Amino acid sequence: DEKSAGGISVPGPMGPSGPRGLPGPPGAPGPQGFQGPPGEPGEPGASGPMGPRGPPGPPGKNGDDGEAGKPGRPGERGPPGPQGARGLPGTAGLPGMKGHRGFSGLDGAKGDAGPAGPKGEPGSPGENGAPGQMGPRGLPGERGRPGASGPAGARGNDGATGAAGPPGPTGPAGPPGFPGAVGAKGEAGPQGARGSEGPQGVRGEPGPPGPAGAAGPAGNPGADGQPGAKGANGAPGIAGAPGFPGARGPSGPQGPSGAPGPKGNSGEPGAPGNKGDTGAKGEPGPTGIQGPPGPAGEEGKRGARGEPGPTGLPGPPGERGGPGSRGFPGADGIAGPKGPAGERGSPGPAGPKGSPGEAGRPGEAGLPGAKGLTGSPGSPGPDGKTGPPGPAGQDGRPGPAGPPGARGQAGVMGFPGPKGAAGEPGKAGERGVPGPPGAVGPAGKDGEAGAQGPPGPAGPAGERGEQGPAGPGFQGLPGPAGPPGEAGKPGEQGVPGDLGAPGPSGARGERGFPGERGVQGPPGPAGPRGNGAPGNDGAKGDAGAPGAPGSQGAPGLQGMPGERGAAGLPGPKGDRGDAGPKGADGAPGKDGVRGLTGPIGPPGPAGATGDKGEAGPSGPAGPTGARGAPGDRGEPGPPGPAGFAGPPGADGQPGAKGEPGDAGAKGDAGPSGPAGPTGPPGPIGNVGAPGPKGARGSAGPPGATGFPGAAGRVGPPGPSGNAGPPGPPGPVGKEGGKGPRGETGPAGRPGEVGPPGPPGPSGEKGSPGADGPAGAPGTPGPQGIGQRGVVGLPGQRGERGFPGLPGPSGEPGKQGPSGSSGERGPPGPMGPPGLAGPPGEAGREGSPGAEGSPGRDGSPGPKGDRGETGPGPPGAPGAPGAPGPVGPAGKSGDRGETGPSGPAGPAGPAGARGPAGPQGPRGDKGETGEQGDRGIKGHRGFSGLQGPAGPPGSPGEQGPSGASGPAGPRGPPGSAGTPGKDGLNGLPGPIGPPGPRGRTGDAGPVGPPGPPGPPGPPGPP
């Protein structure tokens, strides 16, 4: 079973070995036996029962060489045994204790060679003897020592990015924002003449929403416009739908108050006018100060549980390997396709209230005008065209305060949404280019090799215990797959133990659940403005009954300039702005967590011929044969049986530490989806400060090297194939006869370096790294040349905007320190069995077998010709040769996932406040005029040129996290971090097939003469 860790499959510990399976079928017959001794002369007698082993005879005199005996024919093949019944699936056992190191088999004592006996007459050919009994399987020889460590391999190419995860669930709505301040009532202006209704304007396209600006200083109040003359009553208009509030234009300079016009006659009440079209798109406001970071989102739901994979055959537990050296930094990975956008989160909490703007300077008081007669209020007429601003009027007395303006609708600022659900696991990346072989690790001690039991169903994973010794027994058939257990916590790092015998590779399991949510990183820069549209205006009420026409009043006095009106409703959200410029390069992040060890690659090329092996133990005593006369040295016997496979090579050292990956921008909380293509951000500025490099992925243990045939140089790791179940054990060969001792052959030279293996699949991505340090503050932008824009008509005050888009990112931060090595990861999957190595050098001859009983005396035969001296039978398989030269360094591992982005850089400097416009004289307050209908929205004013940059503003509260920006270019390589802890030993691979038959050993030295045989019976007359 696997637990999720940030979307990374972490293999759980292997289940314990199941019970011993039933014995398999008998093996195939062994190779041809050695040449038998010459038969005794004379008619063969009936085979007598096997007698007890007799004492060795006294040494005899040197006899003449006898004729070479004919080789005996091979024994007949025994019938195959019945197939054993399939073993029942074993129940999961407790984790076994670590097994003791097995003792090497002792060499059998070599018998003393007896002196050669007198040369007897050549014997007649003997009958073919019955096939000898199958001897017990010899003990494995002492394991060869692994070679010295080679340089670390270079990093392999990065795998393709996985598919994006599904969007997370929508979070709960946040609390409502702060209510807007009540606007001061404007002074009543003089009643203007009603203008004729203008044509309905064309509805403008909604503009993209500008980022919410921080509360800026209050501008100087503009001058009131000159009241227009009252127009004639228009015909009742058709009731229109409520219009959208137009964007607020820049405040124009205050013009002088115009003289009050004469009050017009009250017009007939007009019908409600048509709703005005949407106003032109407003210019985006300045970037707002970042709000405080939102609370951490809820933890994402646990992903769907993967289907349990078939239970692999458990291999014997291996001993822990020695520590590996740190791998080289990895190269940058290619950004994957952009994942689908997650569901929109709830609005974040309301940002802090902006500081109040500076109060406008009061204008000089004008002379009070004469009070005019109050006219009857007329019915509201249709909207008049907006006239140009009139000349500045004289300042009058301030009028009475008007009623408070209607409170604008506050936009709801919600909290950040909960963490989205974990995405589906991405597809495995493309297979990378094969890396050169890794360095050979230190030799592990021999473990006790046992036969494997059938796999039991997977039980619940416990704490990882010490490796237990391999259980004996033949390999049973695999049991049905049990339900996957919960993954246990990784065990503490233990002292590297002895290397055990390799086990078969298990099938690769399904991808596990996503991991637990990581620690909340520092808040990122403010995100783009939400796309919640403001509410529409309410429907216009029905027109009231027309009032009685009033009498013509005297012209009123010129009114005072009105106060600023209440804030208007916000306009609809505009289209998304163009993409901002590419952000500055991010600073390199910390080292990623040590990645999981990739699967073991295919076996490397066959190693060079190994050194001559030690002599094997003495075989059991064969049946006592009839003793013949000593013959001449026989012809070379047939090749001996193939030796056992050599011990597994030492585990390779982990690769060197990877290069620091690029810092990724901070994404929303939750498991990182694959990096999307650099989409056009909103009206986003430079990319936020680069985030820290992800922590180094947890290092997996080095995979166990498959058994080499003879120890050659270590081949490169290749991709992991799904290991099939091991085949049934082959039949034990019949024991051949013992040949004469061969001479010690020369030691083989080290093998040539084999070509690198095919690339392995990319490993799982590491967990997101810890946050890096904040970037340095950004440099102020160039000073713009301000040019006063055309004054637009004042619009209604907009509502408080949403938090602004993040400001430009600061300069890239300096490279962070190397991260400490990650915790040891679980063992990687086992690789396929290694290929058989090349034949080893001829081994030293084994110890002589037990002495047979003395044979019956044969009659002396005629003296034969001296046989030719030939090579003796092959010796026992040689021990593994010395390790070959270390291969070139492999490429470094895959780059870890992009870590969360670092904190946002400090806010850029605020722009300088523009110069205040000239204050016009205050006009006389006129009579309160009738309330006119809503005017047609004016044209959008031209945006002014950028003003000079102001001094840096104080950093605002941190805003909610923004969307992840595109990944910056790759930072410089970080310095090598400290080596991580040793990875756990990988499971040993299955034993490879036996290597080819060893070379026939050179002829051994002629042994001393054997003891003389007793005189034979007299020959026939």
From Swiss-Prot:
Positions carrying 4-hydroxyproline: 23, 26, 29, 38, 41, 44, 59, 74, 80, 89, 95, 122, 125, 131, 140, 146, 167, 176, 179, 206, 209, 221, 227, 236, 242, 245, 260, 269, 272, 284, 293, 308, 314, 323, 329, 347, 356, 362, 368, 377, 380, 389, 398, 404, 416, 425, 434, 437, 455, 472, 478, 484, 490, 496, 502, 514, 523, 534, 546, 549, 555, 561, 570, 588, 603, 630, 636, 639, 648, 654, 681, 690, 702, 708, 717, 726, 729, 750, 759, 768, 777, 794, 803, 806, 812, 827, 833, 839, 848, 854, 874, 877, 880, 952, 955, 973, 988, 994, 1009, 1012, 1015, 1018, 1021
Residues with 3-hydroxyproline modification: P716, P993, P1008, P1011, P1014
Recorded GO MF terms: extracellular matrix structural constituent conferring tensile strength
Listed Pro residues bias regions: 166-178, 826-836, 871-886, 1006-1021
PTM text: Contains mostly 4-hydroxyproline. Proline residues at the third position of the tripeptide repeating unit (G-X-Y) are hydroxylated in some or all of the chains. Contains 3-hydroxyproline at a few sites. This modification occurs on the first proline residue in the sequence motif Gly-Pro-Hyp, where Hyp is 4-hydroxyproline.
One of the GO biological process terms: extracellular matrix organization
Composition-biased stretches (Low complexity): 31-50, 112-128, 146-164, 212-262, 371-425, 484-493, 536-558, 615-629, 642-672, 698-714, 743-752, 762-777, 838-853, 907-921, 955-988
5-hydroxylysine carried by residues: K98, K263, K338, K582, K693, K863, K925, K937
Record field: compositional bias (Basic and acidic residues): 62-76, 922-936
Residue spans of biased composition, Gly residues class: 318-327
Residues carrying covalently attached carbohydrate according to the record: K98, K937
Subcellular location field: Secreted; Secreted, Extracellular space; Secreted, Extracellular space, Extracellular matrix
Tissue: Expressed in bones.
Residues with Phosphoserine modification: S4, S104, S618
Recorded GO CC terms: extracellular matrix; extracellular space
Note: These protein fragments were extracted from an ancient scute bone collected in Buenos Aires in Argentina.
Record function comment: Type I collagen is a member of group I collagen (fibrillar forming collagen).
Family: Belongs to the fibrillar collagen family.
Subunit comment: Trimers of one alpha 2(I) and two alpha 1(I) chains.
Name of the protein this chain belongs to: Collagen alpha-1(I) chain
Organism: Doedicurus sp.
